[in-house]
Amino acid sequence: MTEIRPKTPLTYAQLRTMAGQELGVSEWTTVDQNRIDQFAECTGDHQWIHVDRERARRQSPFRTTIAHGYLTLSIIGALALGMGIVPENTQAAFNYGFDKVRFLAPVKVGARIRLRTTLLSMEDRGPGQYLMKAANTVEIEGEKKPALMAETLVMLYERRKRAGA
């Protein structure tokens, strides 16, 4: 797996002015069979198209195993963190949900993927609380069609300054 090096995070003030702007592109990461197998173990989804290399070679239209769509979707969080998308001075960031998730192309075993993210909005949800909505595209190296597109919703809690600090 490719190591993802964190970049300098943006501030809340910067993000509030960046709707419609691309936040960045992640490093490439390889989706190998071990990663697919571990995801199958965690989720109980042992469908042959993901874990049986020989059968996939013979019977799959892709002639190899492919990553679970939900595995590809779940990788978004780690790739986004590596891009410095979570603002500095964040106390906590929680997944709030997804909108418009579309699985557009299979990720074949051994493929390299990366994340491209555009900020859609930063909505105030109370003192120091923001709902960040971003458009995400997971690209497959060497392929024209992306693996998936999804809008992520992340609830951010800004670290509060302590009285007297």
Regions found by a protein language model. Give the residues of each.
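HotDog/MaoC-like acyl-thioester-processing domains
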Residues: M1-M18, P106-A165
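Catalytic strand-loop segment that frames the active site of acyl-thioester-processing enzymes
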Residues: T2-A67
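Generic structural detector for well-ordered beta-strands
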Residues: G24, W28-T30, R102, L153-M155
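A generic structural signal for short beta-strands and their flanking turns/coil linkers
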Residues: E27, R35, D45, T90-D99, ...
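Predominant activation on well-ordered alpha-helical scaffold segments within soluble catalytic domains
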Residues: D37-A40, L73-G77
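Hydrophobic beta-strand-centered segment that forms part of the acyl-chain substrate-binding groove
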Residues: S60-A67, S74, A78-R116
